[in-house]
């Protein structure tokens, strides 16, 4: 179902059973999978969104990367099945390097106000709590938990199942299966 107030670009491919809410803007080069809900006032462009996803109000998916070298190249966001992106979250499309893509795995949860910058790669089942921020080119492994208001500098790698406590910030990679907190995160527990 597509609400009559939604604005849909002619190139968009939307599954017949997807739900597009009021005042949603679906821009060019978008694919939306079966049973996915894009709720009121969300903005999506240059993105492939899997099945059974939820994009909450005022989320922005696929806008231009914050990269001074970006010159309008054809880049995108790919979001796996079952992912939930909450209110005011932002996911920028890739910059013109690597595979030109920002990737979010399956069954991830990006809570209110999170930011995933250009060319980031999130594994499956990643949780980003409110206001967690990833700089460009970060890689987050399977099942990692990023606490509220955490900040990760560009190119940081977070290992599988790592847990980073809220209010932490790092320029350093985080080991798999570790727990850390602080600036930079110090192993704990």
Please state what every model-predicted region is:
Residues 183-189:
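Conserved beta-strand-loop-alpha-helix hinge in the C-terminal portion
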